Amino acid sequence: MKEGKNYAFIDSQNLNLGIKKLGWKLDYKKFRVYLQEKYKISKAYMFLGYLPDNQSMYSSLQGAGYILVFKPIIISREDGKIKGNVDAELVLQAMIDFKKYDKAIIVSSDGDFRCLVEYLYNKNKLEKVMSPDVNNCSVLLKKSAKEKIVFMDNLQDKLGYKRKSTA
């Protein structure tokens, strides 16, 4: 792996919800360092729905070294849930930058990324697919990533947010 020519493309909602299902909270600063040290990631794109109330979180993520790519959110009329589906933006950015990186890491469990993962794999551009949770990862994604899939289930000690004790 060449130093500094690998990019990460992170489906933030999928990552956040996947880790939450495992019962822990990801320390995004540690995660960015981990991506740099383990996979030589020079650019880490994080795709997320934009909510004005989350400005301090966005600033914190940018301070940790993420490049944020926003999508306007939609509020469902039926249940009031907020939707910020970023799949198309992630795929588009991965293709825009295709000639700029040596290898890509896709962080998601979403089977909608199967075609991107398959394409990157066939072009020898896929470093890894990082899925937050082995039990909630799409079978399509697992099949297309083949031996290049890793799961974050066992990374809690390394990447979990730890509260500072006030004692």
Name every feature range the model reports, one short phrase each.
Residues 1-167:
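Terminal and domain-boundary accessory regions
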